[in-house]
Amino acid sequence: MALWRAYQRALAAHPWKVQVLTAGSLMGVGDMISQQLVERRGLQQHQAGRTLTMVSLGCGFVGPVVGGWYKVLDHLIPGTTKVHALKKMLLDQGGFAPCFLGCFLPLVGILNGMSAQDNWAKLKRDYPDALITNYYLWPAVQLANFYLVPLHYRLAVVQCVAIVWNSYLSWKAHQF
């Protein structure tokens, strides 16, 4: 409980910084899970640079973009009723999620030094599967998130659930 209270105080004092650092940290955890549990690399074969890339993506892309999106979404659809939550989820999953994945996957490719042609081929190959997999997890999570969770905690809640999602995204983004 002390850790949670410290997190709440930090979030109240520095909401943007804490949200971005939370996203980066949990993206890194997701990559470590991907490398160790999914890919079974072992500690000797763990790619620390890849984990750092995912942390950087979390801090520099996921945290700011998703955190900013939640603010925009709350401005576009103010309110916390079930109907408001449903509208937010539909806009999030119908508009934001496809665009986010369409940016995230090529960004990982760029950071991994892929050529534009290889990156485009990888996006065409991986995007449909990633988007379909997104729809298995996120609509229910986001519906609950938009209905039950205050705005300043949404990114943290999503990133906690996203540890599994980040593991999947890291695995998907690093298949060559």
Curated annotation (Swiss-Prot):
- Membrane topology per the record? Multi-pass membrane protein
- Cross-referenced InterPro entries, in alphabetical order? Mpv17_PMP22
GO cellular component entries: mitochondrial inner membrane; mitochondrion; peroxisome
Highest rank taxon of the organism = Eukaryota
Q: Name one Pfam family in it.
A: Mpv17_PMP22
Per the record, where is site Determines ion selectivity? 92
Alphabetically list the UniProt keywords.
Deafness, Membrane, Mitochondrion, Mitochondrion inner membrane, Transmembrane, Transmembrane helix
Q: Report the GO molecular function annotations.
A: channel activity
Major subcellular site: mitochondrion
Protein localization:
Mitochondrion inner membrane
Query: Gene deleted: what happens?
Result: Mice lack expression of this protein resulting in the development of adult onset nephrotic syndrome and chronic renal failure. They also develop severe morphological degeneration of the inner ear. In the inner ear, mice lacking Mpv17 display degenerative changes of the cochlear structures already at the age of 2 months. The degenerative changes are patchy arranged throughout the entire length of the cochlea and involved the organ of Corti as well as the stria vascularis epithelia with alterations of the basement membrane of the capillaries.
Ranges that cross the membrane: 18-38, 53-73, 94-114, 131-151
Expression by tissue, per the entry, reads: High levels in heart, kidney, and brain, intermediate levels in testis, and low levels in liver and spleen.
Is Membrane given among the entry's keywords?
yes
Q: Which family does it belong to?
A: Belongs to the peroxisomal membrane protein PXMP2/4 family.
Q: What biological function has been recorded for the protein in this entry?
A: Non-selective channel that modulates the membrane potential under normal conditions and oxidative stress, and is involved in mitochondrial homeostasis. Involved in mitochondrial deoxynucleoside triphosphates (dNTP) pool homeostasis and mitochondrial DNA (mtDNA) maintenance. May be involved in the regulation of reactive oxygen species metabolism and the control of oxidative phosphorylation.
Report the protein name in the record.
Mitochondrial inner membrane protein Mpv17
- The organism is Mus musculus
Gene field: Mpv17
